[in-house]
Amino acid sequence: MNIVLEPGAAALLDALHRAGFGAYAVGGCVRDSLLGLAPHDWDLCTAARPGQVMELFGEDRCIPTGLQHGTVTVKRDGKLYEITTFRTEGRYSDGRHPDSVAFVPDLREDLARRDFTINAMAYSAEEGLCDPFGGREDLARGVVRAVGEPLRRFGEDALRILRLYRFAARFGFAIDEATEAAAKQLASHLDCVSAERIEEELNKLLAAPQPGAYLEPEVLAFVLPCLLYTSD
């Protein structure tokens, strides 16, 4: 299936390209487009540094939403677009957020830090689909699989464990065996995640067509301990 860029996103990407910066739509918008779904948001990534993005589009149109992580939100035609510089991430001492980030020129390095292969794809009209981890194949197979080493991905950010089941439930996908084994092994790390973020992910999971098939007891035991003692 061809990806049709939303007009505002296409215009921003074109401006970045004309200024000499590699730039792509990335993540969920690419995934949903390949599935034939309408993306809710269009996230963009680029080799341009945050200051260069703000200079290109003008400070009056830019919101410095996360400069330390390379993110600038750009206003265009009444919509907001997050543009993030390609980056790698350091250690996750708190099991939730990186201690540091480093801006890099290579898109593939940026994609390598992402959670699942189906979310680690990028697209531009000039270069087409960039899919170094087989996300498109996993979409076709109906599988959610971690990028790289699953234990590392979940060790970096325990909330990804719930995101694993949420994405599987949303799309009716199977879960890669090694990925699920790592999620169960590190489920206790969910203790480090705030109740608000856990509630948000659980609500999204429960909104899926058949959430019961993905409510994994070994994981929920660390999120909702009361379930261990529930009886009819």
For each feature predicted by the language model, list its residue ranges.
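Catalytic cores of the polymerase beta-like nucleotidyltransferase superfamily
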Residues: 1-232
